Regions:
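A mid-to-C-terminal "edge-of-domain" accessory segment
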Residues: 18-144
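C-terminal helical cap(s) of enzyme catalytic domains, especially alpha/beta-barrels
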Residues: 1-23
Length: 144
């Protein structure tokens, strides 16, 4: 059985279907299905998986903000999902600078390197996950 989320998105975006699929309810529909069946979808599932629009911070995040379509051909809001950014041991200097900015700290090269090194030395993987709402996205872009 083909997955509903992928098929409906393909019909809408790639085949320009004249049908009015309500893609914005796909994530809610997936969660409802999970509640009834007690079958959790894989985190890596496209469209509705918990990692579908999750991005590690750093240069990857900078690229997402410059040109989201390069990494996300289907916008997260269109399918009821949202973009999330993750800070942790892979953040790097750029990611650390973004984190400092979001926390209201003055970001400089030395501070960003120190934060990146501290995150890496903790060796705890992903430490902070933040839903990237419009307000935060604008702040990151303005603070470049």
């Amino acid at each position: 059985i083909p997955p509903l989320a992928e098929v409906s998105v393909a019909f809408t975006y790639f085949y320009k279907s004249p049908h009015d699929f309500r893609l914005y309810i796909l994530l809610d529909l997936s969660k409802l299905s999970e509640d009834y069946t007690e079958i959790k979808p894989y985190d890596s599932n496209p469209i509705v998986g918990s990692s579908a629009y999750k991005h590690k911070a750093g240069t990857h995040l900078a690229a997402i903000l410059r040109n989201p379509a390069a990494y996300e051909p289907i916008p997260p809001r269109a399918v009821g999902n949202r973009r999330r950014i993750v800070f942790g041991e892979l953040a790097g200097k750029t990611g650390a600078a973004y984190l400092m900015s979001l926390l209201g700290l003055e970001k400089d090269d030395i501070g960003a390197k120190a934060v990146a090194s501290g995150l890496k030395n903790l060796r705890m993987g992903d430490l902070i996950e933040i839903p990237l709402e419009d307000r935060l996205e604008k702040k990151i872009i303005e603070d470049k």
